[in-house]
Amino acid sequence: MVAVAAPAGAAESAPARQAAETCWATHYGPQPPGALTASGELFDNNADTAATSLTRNPQLPFGTLVRVTNVANGASLVVRINDRGTFQQTPAEPKCLDLTDGAFSRLGGVLNPDQGHIVVTQEVLG
């Protein structure tokens, strides 16, 4: 790698990107027909969307994009926050996202028999 000097007056380096947070992602499971998310959208259990944990402070705004990566297999996808969850912290890992069943499966989560959660990293993209 070759170092390149910054132009005079430029900042020495851009701030380092914050490390991705490790946490548990769960999934919704069956929802009644016509269910709405907290953002008012019709719930789609196959969409790449998620609820953010109410234990997160501050809350991620609706529409925030988050890259979620399964630590066990490296599978990754970007989900859009459109709901709020009611999760609680656990001694092992905080619960951070409640994924749709489709997103959970695409990341390698097992629905039947239900493994309950997967350990993920999450990176807020914007």
Regions found by a protein language model. Name each.
Residues 1-126:
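Secreted/periplasmic proteins
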